[in-house]
Amino acid sequence: MDHIYICRFFSIPNTIKTKNKSHTCPDLSGAGSFFIPFGSNLPKPESINFLRGYGIWGAIDRLGIPKFLQKDLNSSTGFLIAHGEVLPREENSVSLSKRTDKWGIPIPHIEFKWSENELNMAKHMESTIRDSIEAADGDIRGIDELIKIPYVGLFTEKSIALSGNPPPPGYYIHEVGGAAMGFNEEESVVNKLNQLWRCSNVLVLDGACWPTSSWQSPTLTMMAISRRACLNIKKT
């Protein structure tokens, strides 16, 4: 699994009345951005035609674009990136290919595509992003409309990440679920404490052990799962 996502850049009327925004705007980071969880001001549940949810990461004037490259000094530049949960499906799988690498080891063969559920979610993401930007008196813009870089349009117009459709699986590099945990050996690779069923001293601690992608960014959850597994080793 990987997160399905939609990314949009935008401009809004200047939010900070100062000659030097760098004094008040930190660099893009966890503290210099915001996150909108799924669930706020939703319409009635029956109008949602997909399972699970998504969140929206964004920031305004945190991209560090030098003033001389900005096309409109009277506006602020921002972005919104929605990423959502992908449901585990038997059709999405990893197996060994007949092809081998230069050491003669079979390479992974990955079967993975978005389902109707994810594509419906992506449409809802797009609608929510547009509504959010409009509510802030903003306009969705292409990169070439925001910054002055020669020929940037030649690259962005073919960018998969900035296209109207969600990029293919693997593009967001939040891959998880290749060795999922579960309740028994027949349906999973590791147990609830991340141990291989037949070799308890081998642990899978990265995103491979996840039975679902959830919609949050995976790093902190990976750290928490790793800590729990290590505490269990210490205890036993």
Which residues fall in each region the model found?
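Glycine-rich loops and low-complexity Gly/Arg-rich segments
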Residues: 104-109, 119-122, 135-137, 205-207, ...
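FAD cofactor-binding and catalytic pocket of flavoenzymes
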Residues: 1-120, 164, 169-175, 197, ...
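A glycine-rich dinucleotide-binding beta-alpha-beta segment and adjacent secondary-structure elements
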Residues: 75-81, 124-213, 219
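Generic structural signal for well-ordered, non-membrane alpha-helical segments
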Residues: 5, 118-122, 126, 219-222
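Generic, well-ordered alpha-helical scaffold segments in large soluble proteins
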Residues: 99, 125-136, 229-236
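Glycine-rich loop(s) and the adjacent beta-strand/alpha-helix scaffold that form part
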Residues: 1-15, 206, 221, 225, ...
